[in-house]
Amino acid sequence: YQDRIEIQMRYFTDGPAYQFQTPTVAGRKDPNENNLAGLFLERVFEIAGDGGYVAQVLPGVIFNGSFSKDLRMKMLNEGRIDSLVTFENKGIFPNIDNRYHFGVVTFKNSGSTKTLEAIFQQHDVEILNSLDEHAVKIPKRILKRYSTESRIFPFITSQKEVEVLDTILSHPSLGDDVSGAW
């Protein structure tokens, strides 16, 4: 059994069929331990083809897990994300743990995302009926600077949070070397 699992894992992480399952984070490879959602999303890119439209319900780890960094970057840089809403499962799926996070993403499988229209940490699916009124606009520069290594998406729930984060990220990070600084 363990040999079969090892062979299967090598197929997904080392084979040519899946290219976005082993991102580099902080200088190290961070392999996807056969997370089926990540594997499925990568296959969706191929199935949808260039210019295809995709709407998916995905586990929250796709939007904030280090192993799914390359999948997020593919959606941002080689696709146009039209909307993203993440939820905390507060009674939405009664038979699933209420701490579970998931997201609904829609994107075009070509182009590039300039501004992400999203809202995070929601508890009621009714938000989907009025998303245009509640979604915040997050410029791509914020997504690039927020988490430079693993490229996780910040859990933003208001336009004010976008503005504050933009101001914070316009300054050098505490870990950056700045010439002439003390």
Residue ranges and their predicted role:
Residues 1-15, 23-27, 49, 92-182:
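Polynucleotide-recognition surfaces of large bacterial nucleic-acid defense/processing enzymes
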Residues 1-85, 125-128, 132-139:
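SAM-dependent methyltransferase catalytic-core segment centered on the flexible catalytic loop
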Residues 81-82, 90-92:
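Conserved beta-strand -> loop -> alpha-helix junction used to position metal-binding or nucleic-acid-contacting
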